[in-house]
Swiss-Prot record:
Species name: Bacillus subtilis (strain 168)
Organism ancestry: Bacteria, Bacillati, Bacillota, Bacilli, Bacillales
Protein name per UniProt: Putative ribosome-binding protein YbzG
Domain of life: Bacteria
Amino acid sequence: MIGQKAWVNIGKTEFILLLVVGILTIINVLTADGEKRTFHSPKKKNINHLTLYDCVSPEVQNSINETGRVTNFF
């Protein structure tokens, strides 16, 4: 779900907290951390490499739904 928080389990960016900013397929999502990976250059991640939390950021979700973009994270 867009705006959902995720923890990276596998890869170079292991142990980093991210936000889901887009959904590509059933398996792949676009993620951003607000520093290295911003909304304008998100990273494609396999959801099997993420731990998804039930916590969804309503600010991020509303901003993406209304304007199609986000200005700041965390």
